[in-house]
Amino acid sequence: LAGYLAMRYILWRSLQSLIYTGPLDFIGMALLYLAEMYGLILLFLGMFVNLWPLTGRPTILPKDATDLPTVDVFIATYNESDDIIRITAIAATQMEYPQDRLRIHICDDGGTLNKRGQPESMEAAWERHYRLRRMAKELGVNYITRGTNGNAKAGNLNHALNHTDGELVLMLDCDHVPTTNMLQRTVGYFLADPKLFLVQTPHFFINPTPVEKNLVGVGNPNGENDMFYRTIHPALDFWNASYFCGSAAVLRRSHLMEVGGICGKTITEDSETAFLLHSKGYNSVYVEQPMVCGLSPENYDDYALQRTRWAQGML
């Protein structure tokens, strides 16, 4: 229906609405027409890409536990509360995977040496540093921080990459709690395909966004994440073009290090990294089953800031 209406609009716009009334009017009319045609081209391209969603991908389970690769779990944090970090770290320790092949790391960018050395942030940074180190020791996981906060999250993850050596890396935001079977349902794909660099899983959120909260009285509308993770991403998977979405993803270290780790040239380091590795001929897999439980921004300011950052980075 959308395609039919778009074609009808193109015919009307091209054959009946373009009337020359003067040079200045023509310039404005032409610019608007070209902008509309560009938008419609993107619409049809998106519809074409989404024609063949790849669903029902079979799970590849490892046959022999001795063949399982080593896995580093990175829990990236900056200024989130200790309680949120603790829940995710505990869940990571409960994942069903051989313990001698699993290492969990809290990657803290809120307690860096730089923050601990600045008068305005010194006290809070030192307190956070000691608290998270104590928490990590209590839970039996590692605590990693660095000297500065350069390149934000990308720099944090790259620092952790340079201080670990697991064959695979599970990336988690600190408010993304993994299921116990997450590694069991993702690691097997890497054993089946040596050129695979990414297995991405959906982001599932337990709380509504500020926009969804205001949609009272209109039933239970599908959120924007549903459209991306249930419709768009399975279609991208058909074209071997899955995104790295920054969290809830397993990556192969060797391929990642070929491009210098997580790319930090833009503020959407995850998508940039996926584009670069796809351009080198490596493969990706999207597993449609949600295997993390996360938190959406709770207020409109944080929501707008997050979406603005995504939009700027993709541009």
Language-model features, listed with the residues they occupy:
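A conserved hydrophobic helix/loop-capping motif in glycosyltransferases and polysaccharide synthases
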Residues: 72-80, 95, 189
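Short, acidic, metal-binding catalytic loop of nucleotide-sugar glycosyltransferases
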Residues: 88-101, 111-112
